[in-house]
Amino acid sequence: MVNKIKGFTLIELMVVVAIIAILAAIAYPSYQEYIRRTKRVEMQTTLQQIAMQVQRYKIANFKVIGATSSDLNIATSYPIQGTPLYTVNLTPVTARALNAETWVLTATPIANTSQSGDGDIVLNYRGERCWTKGTDINSGTACVPSTTSNWDGK
């Protein structure tokens, strides 16, 4: 009788390890970009919530000019729980049409975080929004929201 040896050869195991390494090299950067995009969308949602708070404050106090973060009951870094990834800045703008008070919210990624270099997210009083892809576009300054701009970067 012939006795057959069962099992895998070293070459077969090396091929499997190589395939797993290639898949991991492709999947990990994709996963990181997915997480980055998810955090950006969370911040966009948070900006919309902050915009509602600003509007509530404006209705109650008839102005936004001079309001502080504590007056508006908003934090300066988000997310509030966990590691902050963005700083939020409310910029009141005066002397617009009919002397109406207007504002712009800008979320800027904090350096040395997972969102670092992801670009500014901007929302204004009209609900117009934009996102600057990366830090090198517009010389590192935020985009200007318009009726044709969007958060998807297109």
Residue spans for each PLM region:
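N-terminal single-pass transmembrane signal-anchor helix
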Residues: 1-34
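Membrane-proximal amphipathic alpha-helices
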Residues: 32, 36-47
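Extracellular/periplasmic head regions of type IV pilus-like filament subunits
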Residues: 63-128
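Alpha-helix exit/C-cap motif
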Residues: 37-41, 52-71
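Low-complexity, S/T/G/P-rich flexible repeat/linker segments used as non-globular hinges
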Residues: 120-154
